[in-house]
Curated annotation (Swiss-Prot):
GO terms for biological process: hydrogen peroxide catabolic process. This is Hemoglobin subunit beta. Residues 2-147 form the Globin domain. Heme b binds at H63, H92. Red blood cells. It holds the Pfam family Globin. The lineage of its organism: Eukaryota, Metazoa, Chordata, Craniata, Vertebrata. The keyword Mitochondrion does not apply. It comes from Carassius auratus (Goldfish). One of its GO terms (molecular function) is heme binding.
Amino acid sequence: VEWTDAERSAIIGLWGKLNPDELGPQALARCLIVYPWTQRYFATFGNLSSPAAIMGNPKVAAHGRTVMGGLERAIKNMDNIKATYAPLSVMHSEKLHVDPDNFRLLADCITVCAAMKFGPSGFNADVQEAWQKFLSVVVSALCRQYH
């Protein structure tokens, strides 16, 4: 993947403004609420019976923070995301058997939460385009083991 200077700047700039400890839990909770079939991968997380239960679930919040830690690794390795994510791809494919379409759903929820947080002034069309390109590269890297 080729990144322009403007794309790198937009991605790194947005990341610098995000609070991963806030956005990660929000995005994962949103994914579990909007796409309830994704809950099947989180059977050990306890009560996921309602939106309020999901939003207040500490295991959901912790895994949301873990997801954001993974995105931070991708940002620090933007020129080598596939290699950076190779172990995660193997784990999600071979051990956890996660449907790879769910990565795109979660990426979309991350984008929605970021857009809601920053609005059109902080999440304009150029930032959104770069951010979604970045997340699509991350999703592709996570799906690599599935091909």
